[in-house]
Amino acid sequence: MKFSVIAAILLFSVFAASAETVYTVDCNGGGDFRTIQECFDALPSKPSEWRTVRIMPGTYREKVTLDVYKDKVRILGDEMAETRIVWGDYAGKVVDGRELTTYDSYTMSVRADEVCLDCLTVENDAGRVGQAVALETRGDRIHLYHCALIGDQDTFFARGYVSRVHVENCHIEGTTDFIFGPSIVLFECSTIHCKAD
């Protein structure tokens, strides 16, 4: 009996020590944050442990950036069709008196290393107006699993020059040059859908 109690205490101690911090984003107000960007801004930089950002179902109409040094993050949606991040910037659009280029037309930019995106959709809904990036990745060791990247021109910009990205069980669609960039990208069991000839 004494051994069982000691074993249980040790097991719980190991589990508690390995438990990661979970942040919840809910656009309906039921989480720690209402917007994804508020959550990303609150993440401590240069972490030693992994964190999870849990995004509840809904459409999050915002432009989001996971900045450099916000490494080791699991960004977990509910389901690909249920958790959607949508924005509509495009090259040539004027925002605050400045004309955007391809490089800042993204809906979501992942600049940190060691990031997992799981079960969500990232969409640029600008339409056929030119370059309009849905997801831009700059960090190294990025893993996309069961995600949808939706757009027209330049949907997925694998921008990092020394970046490795693994795309698994995902759906990517667009019209012109919709997957581009200098990164090393491995596509596995994924659907690439061209919406135009």
Question: Language-model segments: which ranges?
Answer:
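Short active-site-proximal "capping" loops at secondary-structure junctions
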Residues: 58-62, 80
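Short, T/G/N/S-enriched strand-turn elements that build extracellular solenoid repeat scaffolds
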Residues: 34-45, 61-70, 75, 111, ...
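Right-handed parallel beta-helix
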Residues: 109-197
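Sec-dependent N-terminal signal peptides
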Residues: 4-15
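Loop/turn elements at helix/coil->beta-strand transitions in domains of secreted/extracellular proteins
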Residues: 20, 48-51
